[in-house]
Structures are given as structure tokens and as C-alpha cells.
């Protein structure tokens, strides 16, 4: 089974991605630094969870885009 993320992590990650889509990549370390600059959380664990979920969303979007391009070629 996968890990369950709390609603705060998902909501914050989606808002950040919606507001700053060009700042985030598929690299967790990069996203971690960007998240720490954009939001002021005291918890390192929460920052890492948000950055990890953003990384997951970015990677899933890129996989979805590649699959759509491949199906369009066929």
C-alpha cells in the first residue's frame, strides 16, 4: 500500500503548483528548496512532504503528456 498524505499537504502542493507552475521540476531536492523559499513552515517534515508530493505530481503530469504524445502518433 502507498503512503497516505494529509489534506494540508495535498492542498498546499496543488496551490503552489497552480500559482508557480514554472518553478517546480521532477527533482525533489530542487523542489524542497523552492518550497522552503515560498512558504514559512517550522516543520521540516511538512516541507519535505509538500515537496515530495509536488515532485510526484510533476512526474505524473510529464508521464501523462508523453503517453498522450505517443498515442497521438499512432
Swiss-Prot record:
One of its GO terms (biological process) is translation. The keyword Kinase does not apply. Signal peptide: none annotated. Gene3D superfamilies: Ribosomal protein S17e-like. It comes from the Archaea. It holds the Pfam family Ribosomal_S17e. InterPro entries: Ribosomal_eS17, Ribosomal_eS17_CS, Ribosomal_eS17_sf. Keywords: Ribonucleoprotein, Ribosomal protein. GO terms for molecular function: structural constituent of ribosome. The keyword Secreted does not apply. Belongs to the eukaryotic ribosomal protein eS17 family. This is Small ribosomal subunit protein eS17. It comes from Aeropyrum pernix (strain ATCC 700893 / DSM 11879 / JCM 9820 / NBRC 100138 / K1). The lineage of its organism: Archaea, Thermoproteota, Thermoprotei, Desulfurococcales, Desulfurococcaceae. The gene is rps17e.
Amino acid at each position: 500500500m502507498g503512503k497516505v498524505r494529509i489534506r494540508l499537504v495535498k492542498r498546499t502542493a496543488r496551490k503552489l503548483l497552480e500559482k508557480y507552475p514554472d518553478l517546480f521540476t521532477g527533482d525533489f531536492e530542487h523542489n524542497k528548496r523552492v518550497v522552503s523559499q515560498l512558504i514559512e513552515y517550522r516543520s521540516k517534515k511538512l516541507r519535505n512532504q509538500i515537496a515530495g508530493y509536488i515532485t510526484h505530481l510533476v512526474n505524473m503530469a510529464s508521464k501523462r503528456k508523453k503517453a498522450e504524445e505517443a498515442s497521438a502518433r499512432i
